[in-house]
């Protein structure tokens, strides 16, 4: 299977490079590495916590605000949110207005629909305690990025304005109680009634770049130090920083370089990008959220123009 092939490729690379330890990146958290220290949460724990049904039950049992989650839509009132039980980035999430639009299949869960601003907290844990680095605004399904539905398309750090309730403190308590290590994230919806926990991510998050830019902290170094029982102090915010993922409106081939000082995750010329897949990320910094958002939108328009011209040639 695909998982076995990934394990093989990692083993081959480890054999060639011979590192002191391995840190697994997003999407590889449950990969198996033999004969070396792996500086991540244990794979079994990550797999368990990545299960959205397990998360909802755990949050409820431990007294944290949660979204009601069921293995079928029968016990919930419509409309319901339908999403994969395992998965990230808002892929496969949709709202079913009634039972005729449910399109139920194996591996899905149903949740009550909750409205609010999407936010996250970036946290470092040492297995017993935890320290929040920053609260972030999450960009979800923003049309100017080309993202559709509930697709994650970036963040702005810090979250402005901060909610009255201390989501950073709540995120620290969740990560500490779960006994998580290294870099973890807690996603929230900020509703009129207060914050609700959406999910816990036991991995490096998409906010890494904006957290580093806005605070000056080295998240990877903080991750490594946590395995020695060292937690950073909560950093001060120095500026606002944003990252947006730009999605392809149609399938096309990259004809020219998209490498600029403000782009990241850049595909090589000649790469084929399929419709609705990410093209690249854009970065911006400024003195406040409004400034950062305006710069991100300007850069997004420029990338759209370049890739539109590119795909028409």
Regions found by a protein language model. Give the residues of each.
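A conserved helix-loop-beta module that forms one wall/lid of the active-site cleft
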Residues: 36-99
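Short amphipathic alpha-helix with an adjacent loop that forms part of the alpha/beta core around
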Residues: 6-17, 73-77, 100-103
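Conserved ATP-binding module of the ATP-grasp superfamily
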Residues: 57, 65-67, 79-82, 91-120, ...
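Peripheral (often C-terminal) accessory segments that flank ATP-dependent C-N-forming ligase machineries
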Residues: 222-313
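A short glycine-rich, hydrophobically flanked beta-strand micro-motif that places a catalytic Asp/Glu
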Residues: 181-192, 235, 313
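Short acidic-glycine loop/turn motifs at beta-strand connectors
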Residues: 97, 125-130, 190-193, 228, ...
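ATP-dependent carboxylate/phosphate-activation module, predominantly the ATP-grasp catalytic core
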Residues: 115-179, 201-227, 235-236
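ATP-binding N-terminal substructure of ATP-dependent carboxylate-amine bond-forming enzymes
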Residues: 1-44, 287-312
């Amino acid at each position: 299977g695909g998982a076995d092939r990934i394990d093989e490729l990692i083993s081959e690379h480890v054999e060639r490079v011979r590192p002191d330890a391995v840190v697994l990146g997003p999407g590889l958290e449950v990969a198996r590495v033999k004969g070396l220290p792996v500086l991540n949460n244990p794979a079994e724990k990550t797999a368990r916590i990545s299960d959205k049904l397990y998360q909802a039950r755990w949050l409820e049992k431990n007294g944290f605000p949660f979204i009601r989650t069921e293995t079928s839509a029968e016990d919930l009132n419509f409309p319901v949110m339908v999403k994969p039980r395992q998965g990230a980035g808002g892929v496969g999430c949709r709202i079913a207005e009634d039972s005729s639009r449910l399109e139920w299949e194996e591996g899905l869960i149903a949740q009550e629909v909750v409205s609010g601003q999407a936010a996250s907290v970036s946290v470092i844990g040492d297995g017993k305690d935890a320290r929040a680095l920053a609260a972030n605004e999450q960009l979800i399904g923003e049309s100017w990025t080309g993202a559709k539905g509930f697709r994650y398309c970036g963040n702005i750090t810090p979250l402005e304005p901060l909610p009255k309730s201390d989501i950073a403190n709540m995120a620290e308590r969740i990560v500490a109680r779960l006994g998580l290590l290294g870099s973890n994230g807690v996603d929230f919806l900020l509703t009129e009634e207060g914050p609700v926990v959406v999910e816990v991510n036991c991995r490096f998050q998409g906010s890494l770049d904006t957290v580093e830019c806005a605070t000056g902290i080295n998240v990877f170094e903080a991750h490594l130090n946590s395995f020695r029982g060292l937690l950073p102090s909560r950093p001060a915010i120095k500026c606002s920083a944003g990252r947006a993922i730009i999605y392809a409106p149609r399938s096309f081939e990259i004809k020219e370089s998209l490498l600029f000082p403000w782009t990241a995750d850049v595909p090589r010329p000649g790469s084929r990008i399929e419709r609705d897949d990410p093209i690249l990320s854009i970065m911006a910094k400024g003195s406040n959220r409004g400034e950062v958002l305006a710069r991100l939108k300007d850069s997004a328009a420029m990338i759209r123009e370049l890739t539109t011209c590119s795909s028409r040639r």
